[in-house]
Structures are given as C-alpha cells and as structure tokens.
C-alpha cells in the first residue's frame, strides 16, 4: 500500500465515540444480570456475554486497523497499556473485596476463593474452571468469581490478536484477512461441535477460548467489512429507513432469543452461538451508523449511563448475587432480596467506575499516590491498602488452616435437624387395621428407587424405613440416561406388583416422548413419579409432564414433592435442590405415605 493510499485512509479512519455500542452493552449487561438473579425470568440472558464478545471483537479490530491506516503501524505496547489501565484495576479491586468478605463472613470458602482469585488475576479463569470440571450453569454453587471466565477469554484475545492482526495487515489485503478470519472462526465452530459431541459437556465448550473464539472473530470480520469510522453521515432517506429496519429487526430477534433460549438447549452448542452472533453483527452495523435512527435510540441517556458502566456492573453483580443468595434457599428468595441485590450492584459498580476506573484511566496509577492533602485521593489510597493487606495474606495461604477448620464444622452441621411432634388423629378401627397391614406390606417390600443426586440424598434415610429397597441414584443423571439402564438392568421390575420410584428432571429438561419411553420400560409395575423442585426455567414444564403422566396412566402415582416442599426452606441446602436431613426425611416420608395410601386403596 503506497503513501497516497495511507493518506486517503487516514481521513476515513479517524476514531470517534460510538454511543450506539454503549446502548447495546446496556441491554447485554441487563440481560446477564436478570439471568443470574433468576434464570426463570430471562432464560437466555446469558447470551448477553456473546453480545459483549462480538462488540469487543468489532471495536478492538476497528481501533487497530484505524491506527494502522492512520500511522502505518500499530503501537502494541501502547495498546496493551491502555487495556491494562482499562481492565485490571477494577478486577483487582473486586477480588480484594471478595477475598476480604470471604475471610470475614465465609471462612469455609477461603481455600477455594484463593485458587479462583489467582486464576482470575492471571486471566486464566476459564481454563481453571475447565480443569476443575466446574459447571457454569450451576448457579447454586458459591463461586463468586466464576463470571470472570469471560474476561479471561477477552484478555487472552487482547494479548494475542493484536500480534496476529499486525502481521496480517503488513502482508495481506483486507479481503485475504477477512477470508483467513472467517476460516478460523469456522474452525472454532467445528471444535465446539466436535468437543460437545464427544464429551457432552456444555461447560467445556462454553468456557473454552478455542471454542468461543468464533464469536470474537465474527466481530473482527465486521470491522473490515463495515469500518465504523469510515461510514458516511449524508445518505438518502431510503437507505436510512432500510438500515433502521435491519437494525430493529435484528434487535427484536436478539431480545426474543433472550426470552426463549435456555442454557440446556443443545442446538446452541451445535452452531447456535455462531448463528446468534452472526445475527448480532447486523445490530452492531446499524448501531454504529451516524445516520441511523436506531443508533439514536441506543444512544438515549439512560442506556448510555448503564452502557458506560457495563463493565463495572458485570464485575459486581455476580459476587453480590452469589453472596446474598447464599443466606437463602434458591427458588424461595423474597422479592425484596432481589431489589437489595440490584441496589448493591449499582452502588458498587458506581464506586468502582467513579473512584477506581475513571481516575486510573485519566491519571494512570498516579491516581493512587499517597497525598494526605487531597482528601478524595487519600481516602481511595487508604481503602485500597485496607483491602489489599488481607487479600495478600489470604492469597499467600496463611488462612488455609482456618478455611479447613470452618469447612469441617459446616459439614458436621449438615447432619443436625429438628423434629416436631404431630397431633394424633383418631381413626376408625377397620381403617387402622388396613393401614397397619399396608404399612407392614410396604416395609417388607423391595421397591426400586431410581433418580439423580436428590435420590442419593435420601438413600440412607429411605433404607431405614424400607430396608430391602434398592437405591440407584447418581449425581448429574438425566432422565434420558436412565432409560437404557432400566432396559438393561431392571427388567425384573417391569411386572405387575413391582414398585418403582422415579425421581428425575432436576438436572435438565426432557420431552413427553422421553418420559413415556421410560415409563413404558417399567411395564405394569406401580410407578411412583416424584415431581421436582428446582429453581430453573424448566421446572414448570417438567412438572406439567409429570402431572399429566400421573393423571393419564393408571399405574403411575404422583409423589408431589413440589407441593409438599413449598414454604419449607429448612428442607433444602443453599442451592434449593439438594436436601438437608430434614428434607431427606420429609421426601422419604412422602414417598412411603404415597405407597401406603395406594396399597390401602387397592384393598
């Protein structure tokens, strides 16, 4: 490329502020926050992360090629310095607060937090969670730094991509660069599909830099095709209308997906993320156009305020939600708690944005110089020191012993429970005799209980009630996994008079056909089907299928755990799914009572 070309391009690629992108960021971060507050409210809110990825790829590439066309080079050190000032101080502030809070209020989590924090500091959280087999979509574990996986991917991208794009710009034409980036994006897509097919692990492909690169690269490609700083403002009204129709349509599709997509939908791991990200390109393209009315909509002041703070809001919302929710049972959290979480998120995000991020962005690390005469700067420095000291001590491992001690104490408390005396109700003698016989029959029976981790929870309690019961519970089991096991191992139970308890659906949705196939595999056996209580978006759909099966099939009897457990937070562990001893006892009693009632009615 000769000097004349560079001079022409220099005028075209002068950077300018793109408010439409901040407006789009606002919608993305709101979606993410709502999803983490309660996935049942916005099941596809997690797609906001993909929106961030596409925006990042687009904006960073636009800035890099703008610099290259204006100066005929890219100052990599200056680029990395800007990224460092923009991203790292806020993350370090967050980590210090989280570690200090953990030390004071959640000492049993010290060791886990130390490891997660180290991974976050070095921006390898995503690979750390993959190595630890962490499930991203398990929102019930107390992992307040888990959301930093996406920042790890972005930072890895910021570190390596400028090197790649500099090399490509020096040696190839834009058309060839676009082709190269497109091919690599397809390779990333292929890796996601293949790895997901082989492992069946949603979180591996969700966390992986290799499998998520596709989304970032689509944004990079758009930067070459639709450079924001080269777009003309003076265009015909027809073109403006066409642009707005495209932008509004794409935005409507994305918002619809936020509501209808679920994190257990398998299609999103088999090309869905790529398609959704591709559709997002059209929204971005119109959002950055200087003549678009849609861009003006995204540039409204409330959206800009949220968008400019989207990074801070993303950082703070998750640990606040996780820590506050840890004092409540998931799925039974009062509305006022959600309001408190939103207010705390806004407060901490504003503190981070105003007193940490903005000063460093303007003054660099001089903003933390120890100047007692400047009250604001002095207070900021003292706060950082107060948070930094305990954080460094935690990271050094000095409190590991304390963490182990509290962890052991908490495990012991899990076995504690309260019992209450029930009022005795007098019954007819004949009824008492039938009930007694039924109870004795049930106690001597040998039912099969098949289920997931909830079945594991009740196993020991249930066998004390019915010693001959066969318990087959497995952590993470889904209904579709149980059907082949039943057909191969439990054929003897597919006979009239046999008793089977089925407790499945906690770990993911299933279809009517899949449920029918499982029930059919038990033949004419008496099946006791347990409804589920799980604070996820599929809870209602699954229970509807369970209720319908119990109503339509004469040999299927409903064990309505969903109804019986309502208003009993003491039954559940923090996640609102797994059971404390009181819950295990209550579910066991409910199953046994249902079996006894059915046995009595038969007589």
Curated annotation (Swiss-Prot):
One of its GO terms (biological process) is lipopolysaccharide biosynthetic process. The keyword Repeat does not apply. The keyword Manganese does not apply. Changing residue 507 to A: Loss of esterase activity using 4-methylumbelliferyl acetate (4MU-Ac) as substrate. It is a multi-pass membrane protein. InterPro entries: Acyl_transf_3_dom, Acyltransferase_3, SGNH_hydro_sf. Keywords: Acyltransferase, Cell membrane, Membrane, Transferase, Transmembrane, Transmembrane helix, Virulence. SUPFAM superfamilies: SGNH hydrolase. Its EC number is 2.3.1.-. It is found in: Cell membrane. It is an enzyme of class 2 (transferase). Changing residue 475 to G: Loss of esterase activity using 4-methylumbelliferyl acetate (4MU-Ac) as substrate. Signal peptide: none annotated. Changing residue 457 to A: 292% increased relative esterase activity using 4-methylumbelliferyl acetate (4MU-Ac) as substrate and 766% increased relative transferase activity with pentaacetyl-chitopentaose as substrate. The chain crosses the membrane at residues 17-37, 45-65, 87-107, 148-168, 177-197, 211-231, 239-259, 268-288, 311-331, 333-353, 382-402. Belongs to the acyltransferase 3 family. Monomer. PANTHER family: ACETYLTRANSFERASE (PTHR23028), ACYL_TRANSF_3 DOMAIN-CONTAINING PROTEIN (PTHR23028:SF53). This is O-acetyltransferase OatA. It comes from Staphylococcus aureus (strain NCTC 8325 / PS 47). The gene is oatA.
């Amino acid at each position: 490329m000769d000097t004349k070309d560079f001079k022409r391009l220099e005028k075209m690629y002068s950077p300018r502020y793109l408010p439409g992108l901040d407006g789009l960021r606002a919608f993305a971060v709101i979606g993410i926050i709502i999803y983490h507050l309660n996935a049942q409210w916005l099941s596809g809110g997690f797609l906001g992360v993909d929106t961030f990825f596409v925006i990042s790829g687009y904006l960073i590439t636009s800035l890099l090629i703008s610099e290259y066309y204006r100066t005929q080079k890219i100052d990599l050190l200056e680029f990395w310095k800007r990224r460092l000032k923009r991203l790292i101080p806020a993350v370090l502030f967050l980590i210090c607060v989280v570690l200090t809070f953990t030390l004071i209020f959640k000492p049993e989590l010290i060791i886990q937090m130390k490891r997660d924090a180290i991974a976050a500091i070095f921006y390898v959280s995503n690979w750390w969670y993959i190595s630890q087999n962490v499930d991203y979509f398990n929102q019930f574990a107390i992992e307040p730094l888990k959301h930093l996986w996406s920042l790890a991917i972005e930072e890895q991208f910021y570190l390596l991509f400028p090197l790649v794009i500099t090399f490509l710009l020096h040696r190839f034409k834009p058309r060839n660069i676009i082709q190269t980036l497109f091919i690599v994006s397809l390779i990333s897509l292929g890796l996601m599909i293949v790895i997901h097919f082989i492992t069946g692990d949603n979180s591996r492909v969700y966390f992986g830099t290799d499998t998520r690169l596709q989304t970032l690269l689509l944004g990079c490609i758009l930067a070459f095709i639709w450079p924001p700083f080269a777009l003309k403002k003076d265009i015909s009204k027809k073109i403006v209308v066409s642009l707005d129709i495209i932008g509004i349509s794409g935005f409507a599709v994305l918002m619809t997906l936020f509501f209808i997509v679920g994190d257990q939908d398998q299609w999103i791991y088999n090309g869905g993320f790529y398609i959704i990200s591709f559709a997002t390109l059209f929204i971005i393209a119109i959002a950055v156009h200087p003549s678009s009315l849609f861009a003006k909509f995204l540039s409204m002041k409330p959206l800009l305020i949220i968008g400019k703070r989207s990074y801070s809001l993303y950082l703070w919302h998750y640990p606040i939600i996780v820590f506050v929710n840890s004092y409540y049972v998931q799925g039974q959290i009062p509305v006022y708690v959600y309001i408190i979480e939103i207010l705390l998120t806004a407060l901490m995000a504003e503190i981070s944005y105003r007193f940490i991020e903005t000063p460093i962005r303007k003054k660099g690390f001089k903003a933390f110089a120890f100047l007692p005469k400047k009250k604001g700067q002095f207070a900021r420095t003292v706060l950082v020191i107060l948070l930094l000291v305990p954080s460094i001590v935690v990271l050094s491992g000095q409190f590991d012993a304390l963490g182990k001690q509290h962890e052991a104490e908490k495990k012991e408390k899990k076995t504690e429970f309260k019992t209450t005396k029930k009022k005795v109700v007098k019954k007819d003698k004949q009824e008492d005799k039938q009930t007694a016989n039924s109870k004795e029959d049930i106690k001597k029976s040998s039912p099969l209980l098949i289920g997931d981790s909830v079945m594991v929870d009740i196993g020991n309690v249930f066998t004390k009630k019915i010693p001959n019961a066969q318990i087959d519970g497995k952590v993470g089991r889904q209904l579709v996994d149980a059907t082949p096991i039943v057909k191969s191992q439990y054929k003897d139970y597919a006979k009239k008079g046999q008793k089977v308890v089925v407790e499945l659906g906690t770990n993911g949705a299933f279809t009517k056909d899949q449920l029918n196939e499982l029930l059919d595999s038990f033949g004419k056996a008496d099946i006791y089907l347990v409804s589920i209580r799980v604070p996820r978006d599929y809870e209602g759909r699954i229970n509807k299928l369970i209720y319908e099966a119990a109503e339509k099939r004469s040999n299927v009897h409903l064990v309505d755990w969903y109804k019986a457990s309502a208003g009993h937070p003491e039954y559940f562990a923090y996640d609102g799914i797994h059971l404390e001893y009181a819950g295990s006892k209550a579910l066991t009693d409910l199953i046994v009572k249902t079996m006894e009632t059915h046995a009595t009615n038969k007589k």
